[in-house]
Each structure stands twice: as structure tokens, then as C-alpha cells.
């Protein structure tokens, strides 16, 4: 009698964040089904957990229209080859991790071949290009969503979706220790501390750094002991920021950090940051914040017409109200930013309300996401 085939899960991750999610999912599945086989497109973390890589994740990790066009033939070849090989393999479940432009079409191809498909991490369909929800519904058996309002959106369109909580909320403590973080960064316990996070992309650092630095200068007039920490994601962004600082605020003393964004948030009394994942991380660090964002005028004009949400930052979207001040475009200027930050640095009622609400929101999305994702995969595999 032939031996029964082990549970076979196919996965495709397209960038580092997806590799981290994939590794967590594989770990949770291996704990329950030790002989399971994992195969697909994987980064180093997924491979370390035992995923067989037919292609390296770097092949898919291209950013920007020009770069994608330059690699389009190769990307289309990889997708066609994966469709053929997964169809022959017939895995119990296929999991496309993020990378929606690549994965959702692949999921649709495999679903037509009778393979069960999951899309892990909802694209921002609730915010813009909402019609994508119909393609997602046709292509997948299940979407795994990090945030409760994402599930509510899919429910409106009868697309199967499971809210699993956010892996970042699982990884960060409910009550982080501010003094420990200050010790790591060399910040006195009794000083006022402000974190500036002007973004991870070159365009963001270019558009925001000058206004953020001028804001810090204004705040130091009110708080002469103000410590300013600036975590930058890599050497390129650091060099870019240093050039702008030399021009705008050469005498402003700041702590420049390589990475360490999370430590900077935990250590600070307030943060001024670009929108994006940083705002969610700052909420989970329980650091009161102001969101400042600026883009090229035409891009902003277009975004205003395409984006369907009332708020841009995840804390506000989760709270369903303006919990965090958002100052966009012309509003994102030093005087207004400083006025919004002053009450947060005072560590009074505004800060305490924000802190307590951040903690409640953290609890709402802290659901052991790796285990929940594994549950969804195993239920679909049956």
C-alpha cells in the first residue's frame, strides 16, 4: 500500500515582511504537522524553517514602475512556471503572502485548477482601487486580514475573510518599559524626548526632514532639555538626512540611530512621523504621536480622489476617530506640527488618553496571528 503523501503547502513570499510572516506560519504548522512539506518562493527565514525554494524571494522583490517594467518578462515567466509546477504538484493549500500584484493572479490560476488558495495580508482595497475586491474574491478561497476593519470590508462583498490579528501586536509587549529603552539609547530618564521618523523611502525623507527638524527647533525653545532621536532605516537614508540637517539645522543636537525605530518610539514622550506601518508600530509602543505627511502636489491631488478613507493613519482607522493628529500637505508645516506636539510632550491628559486607547487597540489586534493563520490553512486543507 502506498504511503500517504504528507501535507503539502505551497507558499510565495515577495519581500522581507512576507518572509517573516511565512516563517512564522511554517513554524506554527510544523508544530502541529511535523512531516508537512513546504515549497515555493521563499526568503532566508522561510528556508531556515524548511521551505524548499524553487525561486529566491529576491526575484520578486522589485519596487517602482520602471523596475517592474524592466523585469516584467522574468516575472511573467516565473508566474507561468509556478502555475505549471504547482498544478502538477497539487498542494493541499497555496498561500500567497502579500505581493498582491504577483500573487492574486497566481491564486486565480491555481483556483481554476482545483487548488485551495489563501491570500495572506489584505491589500489596502478598503482605501483605494476598491474594485480589486472582486478579483480577490474570484481568485482566493480565503483572505487572512490583520485588522478588524479589513474583515468588515470583505464581509460587505461576501468575500471569505478571517481576521487573525497582527503579528507586530503579538511581538510587542502591552506595557513597554520606557526607562529600559532610554538606557539602551543613552537618554536620561527625566528628560523630555521626541522621536522624528521622516519615513523609510527616499522621497519621504526628502519631503519631510526639513519641516521635522524645524519643528524640533521650535519645541526646544519650550523644552531646553529636549532630547531628539532620529532612527533611520539604512545608511542611504541616514546620509540623506544628515545632508538636509547640515543645511537646515546644523546646530540642533540629535541622536542619529541606525534602525532602532522601535526602541526610539518606546523611549520617547512623543513622536513625529510619516504615515504607514510606523504609525501602527508607534501605537503598539504606546508613544503619543502626530502624523505629518507631504507629497508632490499632483500625487496628493490624485490620492485625494482615489483614497476612500477618512483617515490616513492606522491608529485612527482602528479607533474610527481622530485619535492622532494628521497634518497633511500644506498643514504639515513646523508651527502647526509643534503646536500639535506640545501637549503630548507635556505628558498630561491628552497623552494619557492616547496611551490608554493605544493599549485597548493593541489588545484588540493581539490574537496570536501565526497560530490563527495555521488554523485557517489546516481547516482549508481538510
Curated annotation (Swiss-Prot):
Enzyme class, first EC level, given as a word: transferase
Example GO BP: lipid A biosynthetic process
Catalyzed reactions: 2-N,3-O-bis[(3R)-3-hydroxytetradecanoyl]-alpha-D-glucosaminyl 1-phosphate + UDP-2-N,3-O-bis[(3R)-3-hydroxytetradecanoyl]-alpha-D-glucosamine = lipid A disaccharide (E. coli) + UDP + H(+); a lipid X + a UDP-2-N,3-O-bis[(3R)-3-hydroxyacyl]-alpha-D-glucosamine = a lipid A disaccharide + UDP + H(+)
Enzyme Commission code: 2.4.1.182
Pathway(s) of this molecule: Glycolipid biosynthesis; lipid IV(A) biosynthesis; lipid IV(A) from (3R)-3-hydroxytetradecanoyl-[acyl-carrier-protein] and UDP-N-acetyl-alpha-D-glucosamine: step 5/6
GO molecular function, one term: lipid-A-disaccharide synthase activity
Protein's name according to its UniProt entry: Lipid-A-disaccharide synthase
Source species: Salmonella arizonae (strain ATCC BAA-731 / CDC346-86 / RSK2980)
Amino acid at each position: 500500500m502506498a504511503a500517504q503523501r504528507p501535507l503539502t503547502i505551497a507558499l510565495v513570499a515577495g519581500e522581507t515582511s512576507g518572509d517573516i510572516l511565512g516563517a512564522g506560519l511554517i513554524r506554527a504548522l510544523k508544530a502541529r504537522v511535523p512531516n508537512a512539506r513546504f515549497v515555493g518562493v521563499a526568503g532566508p527565514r522561510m528556508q531556515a524553517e524548511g521551505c524548499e525554494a524553487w525561486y529566491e524571494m529576491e526575484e520578486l522583490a522589485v519596487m517602482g514602475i520602471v523596475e517592474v517594467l524592466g523585469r516584467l518578462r522574468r516575472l511573467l515567466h516565473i508566474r507561468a512556471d509556478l502555475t505549471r509546477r504547482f498544478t502538477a504538484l497539487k498542494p493541499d493549500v497555496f498561500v500567497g503572502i502579500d505581493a498582491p500584484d504577483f500573487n492574486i493572479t497566481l491564486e486565480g490560476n491555481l483556483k481554476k485548477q482545483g487548488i485551495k488558495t489563501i491570500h495572506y495580508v489584505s491589500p489596502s482595497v478598503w482605501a483605494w482601487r476598491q474594485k480589486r475586491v472582486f478579483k480577490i474574491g474570484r481568485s482566493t478561497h480565503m483572505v487572512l486580514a490583520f485588522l478588524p476593519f479589513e474583515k468588515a470590508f470583505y464581509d460587505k462583498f461576501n468575500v471569505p475573510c478571517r481576521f487573525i490579528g497582527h503579528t507586530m501586536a503579538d511581538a510587542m509587549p502591552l506595557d513597554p518599559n520606557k526607562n529600559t529603552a532610554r538606557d539602551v539609547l543613552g537618554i536620561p530618564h527625566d528628560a523630555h524626548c521626541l522621536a522624528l521618523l521622516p519615513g523609510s523611502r527616499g522621497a519621504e525623507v526628502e519631503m519631510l526632514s526639513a519641516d521635522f527638524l524645524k519643528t524640533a527647533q521650535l519645541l526646544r525653545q519650550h523644552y531646553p532639555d529636549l532630547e531628539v532621536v532620529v532612527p533611520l532605516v539604512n545608511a542611504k537614508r541616514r546620509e540623506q538626512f544628515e545632508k538636509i540637517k547640515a543645511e537646515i539645522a546644523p546646530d540642533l543636537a540629535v541622536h542619529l540611530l541606525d534602525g532602532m525605530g522601535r526602541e526610539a518610539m518606546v523611549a520617547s514622550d512623543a513622536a513625529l512621523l510619516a504615515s504607514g506601518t510606523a504609525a501602527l508600530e508607534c501605537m503598539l509602543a504606546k508613544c503619543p504621536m502626530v502624523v505629518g505627511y507631504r507629497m508632490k502636489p499632483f500625487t496628493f491631488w490624485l490620492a485625494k480622489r482615489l483614497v476612500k478613507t477618512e483617515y490616513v493613519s492606522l491608529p485612527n482607522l482602528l479607533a474610527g476617530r481622530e485619535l492622532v493628529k494628521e497634518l497633511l500637505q500644506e498643514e504639515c508645516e513646523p508651527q502647526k506640527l509643534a503646536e500639535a506636539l506640545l501637549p503630548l510632550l507635556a505628558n498630561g491628559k491628552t497623552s494619557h488618553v492616547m496611551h490608554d486607547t493605544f493599549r485597548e487597540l493593541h489588545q484588540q489586534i493581539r490574537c496570536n496571528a501565526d497560530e490563527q493563520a495555521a488554523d485557517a490553512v489546516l481547516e482549508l486543507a481538510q
